[in-house]
A protein has these predicted regions:
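Short, surface-exposed, polar/charged, turn-prone segments marking secondary-structure boundaries
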Residues: 15-16, 47-50, 69-73
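Short secondary-structure boundary segments
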Residues: 23, 46-47
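Short beta-strand/loop segments at the ligand-binding rim of alpha/beta enzyme cores
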Residues: 12-23
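Conserved beta-strand positions in the central sheet of alpha/beta enzyme cores
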Residues: 42-43
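Active-site-adjacent beta->alpha loops and helix N-cap segments on the catalytic face
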Residues: 1-11, 27-35, 49-64
Length: 97
């Protein structure tokens, strides 16, 4: 995705319009990213038809789209430039098992 900011902005400004990404998706992870940004669907052709295993690639995209959409609907946590501890560990020993 060349401009995730633009897709995020479109979703925010057009919350009740169906938004579909129809170009630039070459890997299942790209579809996940589009769906996590709030897109309603993706259109695919070359990424599936030109793969070495189109049936397997179609399955991978199906799972990627489902996961991305479910993540968006579940409410992704905001991204951060720094790691932020969310587990209270103050005064507790920390042991890796």
């Amino acid at each position: 995705l060349l401009n995730p900011w633009a897709l995020r902005t479109l979703r925010a400004r057009l919350p009740h319009i169906t938004l579909i990404v129809d170009a630039g998706l070459g890997a299942p992870s790209h579809a996940t990213a589009a769906m996590e940004l709030g897109m309603d669907a993706v259109l695919l052709n070359s990424a599936v038809s030109q793969s070495h295993n189109p049936v397997g690639m179609a399955s991978a995209f199906r799972h990627a789209v489902q996961g991305g959409r479910e993540g968006f609907l579940s409410g992704l946590m905001p991204s951060s430039d720094m790691a932020v501890a969310t587990t209270p560990v103050g005064g507790q020993p920390f042991v890796l098992l």
